[in-house]
Each structure stands twice: as structure tokens, then as C-alpha cells.
Amino acid sequence: MSRSIKKGPFIDDHLMKKTLKAKEGKDNRPIKTWSRRSTILPEMIGFTYNVHNGRVFVPVYITENHVGYKLGEFAPTRTFKGHKGSVQKKIGK
């Protein structure tokens, strides 16, 4: 179920403060965040965010196409290395 329109998009307060501070200071350094649940707003376009995926920080550069999505959608948490059985079958043949 999607979020109600009357509530508006969710973004953590500390992340919005960091974004506005970087915007007024013309700072080009990446903004480090653990807030994967925050929605990407138009004010965030042009900035790079280091989004934590549970192990490392993944750099995400925000463009117009990212608006409306969550930050966590661009920092995958799982890595698929393949099924063990299929590799052994190829070697055995």
C-alpha cells in the first residue's frame, strides 16, 4: 500500500538539513547517510549521497529520473553469486 498523498513524501529531518546546508554552501562532497527509507526530492538533484547498504557506503548520484524513489533502491544489500549446483554440473561434463 502506498503512502497517502495528503501526508507528503517522507524524508529524515537530518538528511534534509544536510542537503539544504550543502546547497547553500555549494559543497560538492558526498553526503553520508544511513537513511535508506528517505524519498528523493527535487531539492536533492545534482548531489551525491553515500547510502549505507549494511556493509559499505554506495555512492548514488541523484538525477531527475531518481525523484520519487527511495535512496535504498539504488544501494543493493544482497549479492547473488550463483547456485552452487549449476557450477559443479558444468565442470563435471
Swiss-Prot record:
Gene name for this UniProt entry: rpsS
PANTHER family recorded for this chain? RIBOSOMAL PROTEIN S19P FAMILY MEMBER (PTHR11880), SMALL RIBOSOMAL SUBUNIT PROTEIN US19M (PTHR11880:SF8)
A molecular function (GO) held by this record is: rRNA binding
The record ties this protein, via InterPro entries, to: Ribosomal_uS19 (IPR002222), Ribosomal_uS19_bac-type (IPR005732), Ribosomal_uS19_CS (IPR020934), Ribosomal_uS19_SF (IPR023575)
What family does the Swiss-Prot or TrEMBL record give for this protein?
A: Belongs to the universal ribosomal protein uS19 family.
The record's function comment reads: Protein S19 forms a complex with S13 that binds strongly to the 16S ribosomal RNA.
**Is the keyword Zinc in the record?**
no
Its cellular-component GO annotations read: cytoplasm; small ribosomal subunit
User: Which biological process annotations from GO are given for this protein?
Assistant: ribosomal small subunit assembly; translation
Return the Pfam families for the record. Answer: Ribosomal_S19
Origin organism is: Helicobacter pylori (strain G27)
Record HAMAP family: Ribosomal_uS19
Q: Which cysteines are joined by disulfide bonds?
A: none
What is the name of this protein?
Small ribosomal subunit protein uS19
Source organism superkingdom? Bacteria
Q: Which UniProt keywords apply?
A: Ribonucleoprotein, Ribosomal protein, RNA-binding, rRNA-binding
Checking SUPFAM superfamilies in the record gives: Ribosomal protein S19 (SSF54570)
